[in-house]
């Protein structure tokens, strides 16, 4: 083996569910001496976030095809070809020994460019249902991994890489030992919030009274409206914040979480060891439902499809969970987590890299 450090190009963009797991793997390999660059788009979150982590980023121009008009669809082959050409030029300069596709539109032309240059392609699918880009790229990938069973029939289940501060939380039986008082309910709608959570949970609080205390993350621009909803329900004491910067501390505080079931959220909740009520985002492929199903099947969570997420149903569910029941659910959540997901993905990247 030569003395030159190995080179990895991470292809991921668009949402935190793609970008944060990619960052976890990148940092793990950088600590082992790898050189890492990122392939993304200039108008999505990776453009600002990745450089803050000390990683250089290259941009190509590409966007999704879902929901586009006929004119855009007709132009798609040319746009994909141009993005492939841009990605190919970037990779010829950087000369990665392996590329890691973590999802997002950028992975499509990026993966094809790597394949055309003879560079090994490693794919990681974060969701319980594979995205369109990864479905297509799996046909040319060197290896495919998945966070949850079912996305690909023969791919290894490795979990989702999650933040180290979440992994470092004490086990549920330690963290929750001796807790009493109101049940602590953490409501998380993501950075954009979730209207159904913002509208429903203040009324749930009114039904449950002083048996619960709520920390509600409302999403951008919704804090005042949600605070007013709690006050209007006679429950002004509950905490409402627009964002939560330190999710590990919020998980440590909580007894139960009410949230959407994006892939990274589900994986973090399992790693933290927390019971959950999941409200999957309504999408035609039911991606978030399939993300949450393993935890429900393990007895660690309950799924409410959005039409069933009513004040009565949620209040009755929370009221029916004793502290003993919540601890059992928390332990089950932790038991199905894969805390070494980052190491598993990094190990596969190392294994297939060109020598």
UniProtKB/Swiss-Prot annotation:
**What topology does the record note for this protein and the membrane?**
Peripheral membrane protein
Pfam families per UniProt: Glyco_tran_28_C, Glyco_transf_28
Segment forming the signal sequence: none
A GO CC term?
plasma membrane
Metabolic or biological pathway, per its Swiss-Prot or TrEMBL entry: Cell wall biogenesis; peptidoglycan biosynthesis
- Can you name one GO molecular function term for this protein? undecaprenyldiphospho-muramoylpentapeptide beta-N-acetylglucosaminyltransferase activity
Enzyme class, UniProt record, top EC level: transferase
| Known EC number | 2.4.1.227
Q: Which HAMAP family match?
A: MurG
* Function according to Swiss-Prot or TrEMBL: Cell wall formation. Catalyzes the transfer of a GlcNAc subunit on undecaprenyl-pyrophosphoryl-MurNAc-pentapeptide (lipid intermediate I) to form undecaprenyl-pyrophosphoryl-MurNAc-(pentapeptide)GlcNAc (lipid intermediate II).
Q: Please list the reactions this protein catalyses.
A: di-trans,octa-cis-undecaprenyl diphospho-N-acetyl-alpha-D-muramoyl-L-alanyl-D-glutamyl-meso-2,6-diaminopimeloyl-D-alanyl-D-alanine + UDP-N-acetyl-alpha-D-glucosamine = di-trans,octa-cis-undecaprenyl diphospho-[N-acetyl-alpha-D-glucosaminyl-(1->4)]-N-acetyl-alpha-D-muramoyl-L-alanyl-D-glutamyl-meso-2,6-diaminopimeloyl-D-alanyl-D-alanine + UDP + H(+)
Its recorded name reads UDP-N-acetylglucosamine--N-acetylmuramyl-(pentapeptide) pyrophosphoryl-undecaprenol N-acetylglucosamine transferase
Q: Which residues bind UDP-N-acetyl-alpha-D-glucosamine?
A: 15-17, 127, 163, 191, 244, 263-268, 288
Q: Set out the biological process GO terms recorded for this chain's protein.
A: carbohydrate metabolic process; cell division; cell wall organization; lipid glycosylation; peptidoglycan biosynthetic process; regulation of cell shape
The protein's superkingdom reads Bacteria
Q: Where in the cell is it found?
A: Cell inner membrane
């Amino acid at each position: 083996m030569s003395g030159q450090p190995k080179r990895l190009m991470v292809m991921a963009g668009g949402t935190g569910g793609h970008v944060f797991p990619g960052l976890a793997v990148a940092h793990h390999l950088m600590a082992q001496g790898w050189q890492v660059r990122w392939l993304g788009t200039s108008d999505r979150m990776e453009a600002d976030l990745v450089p803050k982590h000390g990683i250089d980023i290259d941009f190509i121009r590409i966007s999704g095809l879902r929901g586009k008009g006929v004119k855009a669809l007709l132009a798609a082959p040319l746009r994909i070809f141009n993005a492939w050409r841009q990605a190919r030029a970037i990779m010829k300069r950087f000369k990665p020994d392996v590329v890691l596709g973590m999802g997002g539109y950028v992975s499509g032309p990026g993966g094809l460019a790597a394949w055309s240059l003879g560079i090994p392609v490693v794919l990681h699918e974060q969701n319980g249902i594979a995205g369109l880009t990864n479905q297509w790229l799996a046909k040319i990938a060197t290896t495919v991994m998945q966070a949850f069973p079912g996305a690909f029939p023969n791919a290894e289940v490795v979990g989702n890489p999650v933040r180290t501060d979440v992994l470092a939380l004490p086990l549920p039986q330690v963290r929750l030992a001796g807790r009493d008082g109101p049940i602590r309910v953490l409501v998380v709608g993501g950075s954009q919030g979730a209207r159904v959570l913002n509208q429903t949970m203040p009324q749930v609080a009114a039904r449950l009274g002083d048996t619960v205390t709520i920390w509600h993350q409302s999403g951008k621009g919704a804090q005042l409206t949600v605070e007013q909803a709690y006050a209007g329900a006679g429950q002004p004491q509950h905490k409402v914040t627009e964002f939560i910067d330190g999710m590990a501390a919020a998980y440590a505080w909580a007894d139960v979480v009410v949230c959407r079931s994006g892939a990274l959220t589900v994986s973090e909740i399992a790693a933290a060891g927390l019971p959950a009520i999941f409200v999957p985002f309504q999408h035609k492929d039911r991606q978030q439902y399939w993300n949450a199903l393993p935890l429900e099947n393990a007895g660690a969570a309950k799924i409410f499809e959005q039409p069933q997420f009513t004040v009565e149903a949620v209040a009755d569910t929370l009221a029916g969970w004793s502290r003993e029941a919540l601890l059992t659910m928390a332990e089950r959540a932790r038991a199905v987590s894969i805390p070494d997901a980052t190491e598993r993905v990094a190990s596969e990247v190392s294994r297939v890299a060109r020598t």
